[in-house]
Amino acid sequence: MGTNSMHVAKTGLNAQQRRMQVIANNLANVNTTGFKRERVNFETLLYQVLRSSGEQTSADTNLTSAFSVGTGVRVVNADKLFSQGSIVSTDNALDLAVDGAGFFQVLLPDGRIGYTRNGTFSRNNEGALTTSSGFVIQPEVVIPEDAQEINVSSDGVVSVQLPGAVEQEEVGQIELAEFQNRNGLQPIGESFYVETTASGEAIIANPLEGSFGKLVQGALESSNVSVVKELVDMIETQRAYEVNSKAISSVDEMLRFISVSYTHLTLPTKRIV
């Protein structure tokens, strides 16, 4: 019984430790552009059914409720909470924020398409629009070297002002991706996600089409992490960890008490001659 109780409390320690790790990661990314906070979800482990509901207690009566003992808890997953972050102005023409639904598409080095809310873009030596890491956005948009002014409309049309030209010239169209199940996306680091069978295939459209959001030029989407909320969760996690640790200590004391009592009962009594 004692070792079972210790095991249950240990599962609580492990679960709270995982939750603390997620909270720490949220706080570490409080200033990461486009970062989405995570929330840990718990579930109970299997129950030991010692007496079933309806079990006969006498000739005319039955047990009204079961006697079941839980065996602990575990972390089942960590959901990404894709609520909108604040739009912060940067006055940089190549900074873009998605206000609403949608992800930017980026070609990763391994050939996969990465999806991100981080719109910190720049140009490479060929004029292509890239992320800070140099990954080219998809579909590719090339800005002419002699462009004097760059404009990105709310529906994703990229236009530039060239020397001597009266009107701006359209050079590309930024498209967004969305998914049936955002939480099915697999985060891979560097603010990128990749699609999985759980997320479903990407739905591609221009900004402002259907339920897609709009683009905001000269701005970035800040993290949706609330420091106050994370600190409250941290204190709650710490208290839960301490309680589970205390449970282990209490069970250990109970076992030592039983061991000492059993020793006293089994020791032979010395006869006084």
Language-model features, listed with the residues they occupy:
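Amphipathic alpha-helical polymerization modules
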Residues: 1-262
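Conserved small/polar residues in nucleotide/adenosyl-binding loops
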Residues: 263-269
